[in-house]
Amino acid sequence: MLTLARQQQRQNIRWLLCLSVLMLLALLLSLCAGELWILPGDWFSPRGELFVWQIRLPRTLAVLLVGAALAISGAVMQALFENPLAEPGLLGVSNGAGVGLIAAVLLGQGQLPNWALGLCAIAGALIITLILLRFARRHLSTSRLLLAGVALGIICSALMTWAIYFSTSVDLRQLMYWMMGGFGGVDWRQSWLMLALIPVLLWICCQSRPMNILALGEISARQLGLPLWFWRNVLVAATGWMVGVSVALAGAIGFIGLVIPHILRLCGLTDHRVLLPGCALAGASALLLADIVARLALAAAELPIGVVTATLGAPVFIWLLLKAGR
């Protein structure tokens, strides 16, 4: 038994090392890639200082943090709601951020700066999170809380559709493209949003024990003495914050929060002590690679990264499910 535990521990360490190497390689490739390829030897030249340090580095850091946040959010929600289909957009938090953004554009008549739009997106996500916490205080079951989140997401989606359909504003039509996901407008001015993600990411990665208990199910968690109401509130709030900041940075991006935790579980990473940091590394790597594809796929334009993640991720996910079912 001890030998099996040691073998599993060594395998987990190998997985984390491999994912760390993959993330570093994806990060280096992201800094080099573009219409103008700049190898590491030229990073400190005048051209490299402009393209690498001022344009590509903030974008790469944003992609890395958003990918980690979305993947961890997916892992947390799948454990919290005991549902393998749970992901960051399921509770309506992403759509809530979109409603906040569109309301800011309408009320500000397109004159608000980017930082104000980001704050409005975070505010929209947090409002939906507060509504969910209100439901949680009524001690609803996990399944009913999940259904409440789905209903809120549908309402927010309907509000966005009505606002965009009846609007003649060019800004709102551009926001529809933005809601498909993209990092094209990210620079060092959005560094405050990146910094807002780091403390929550680190904190959640340290909460493996309650996450492991939650994954056993609601009844088992109560029997083991876990304060379920407290952890449900805290984790919903943390997820809402991460998703709100991610939407403010890059728009709505699917696939990462749903598929990355699944892939790691299929690879044998079920302990949240390994799964949470593994999701951060794998989510960052996957989104970095998707961003590189989005930049290089078209010569004079950039694909929405949400389209890239869905196009590349869905077939891989289906293949993994078929492989696991054999």
UniProtKB/Swiss-Prot annotation:
The keyword RNA-binding does not apply. Keywords: Cell inner membrane, Cell membrane, Membrane, Transmembrane, Transmembrane helix, Transport. InterPro entries: ABC_BtuC-like, ABC_transptr_BtuC, ABC_transptr_permease_BtuC. It is found in: Cell inner membrane. One of its GO terms (cellular component) is plasma membrane. One of its GO terms (biological process) is cobalamin transport. GO terms for molecular function: vitamin transmembrane transporter activity. Pfam families: FecCD (PF01032). Gene3D superfamilies: ABC transporter involved in vitamin B12 uptake, BtuC. The complex is composed of two ATP-binding proteins (BtuD), two transmembrane proteins (BtuC) and a solute-binding protein (BtuF). This is Vitamin B12 import system permease protein BtuC. It comes from Escherichia coli O127:H6 (strain E2348/69 / EPEC). The gene is btuC.
